Amino acid sequence: MTVTNTPTPTFDQLTRYIRVRSEPEAKFVEFDFAIGHPELFVELVLPQDAFVKFCQHNRVVAMDEAMAKAVDDDMVKWRFGDVGRRLPKDPG
């Protein structure tokens, strides 16, 4: 068995993700921001210009459709139980 020591990335090396929730022409940009793990995010709101600067400063990566779906599925699972189930299982 070979053991490899993979260095853990520092905080500054972690990927920063965004997912825009607002419409493109909205005055304020509503978006999710995550560091390292797309499923652990905060919801933020910034004016358009500030959002652009925020993204440049943080060197963000936009979540693709597959990432967004995985995050949404995970949210449903935690909120309602099994993925896709919105009601408790019938005991009888």
Curated annotation (Swiss-Prot):
The keyword Nuclease does not apply. Pathway: Aromatic compound metabolism; phenol degradation. GO terms for biological process: phenol-containing compound catabolic process. Disruption phenotype: Cells lacking this gene cannot grow on phenol. Keywords: Aromatic hydrocarbons catabolism, Plasmid. GO terms for molecular function: phenol 2-monooxygenase activity. The keyword Transmembrane helix does not apply. Homotrimer or homotetramer. Interacts with the phenol hydroxylase components DmpL (P1 component) and DmpN (P3 component). DmpK is an auxiliary protein associated with the multicomponent phenol hydroxylase DmpLMNOP and it may be involved in the post-translational incorporation of iron into the oxygenase component of the phenol hydroxylase. Required for growth on phenol but not for in vitro phenol hydroxylase activity. This is Phenol 2-monooxygenase, auxiliary component DmpK. The gene is dmpK.
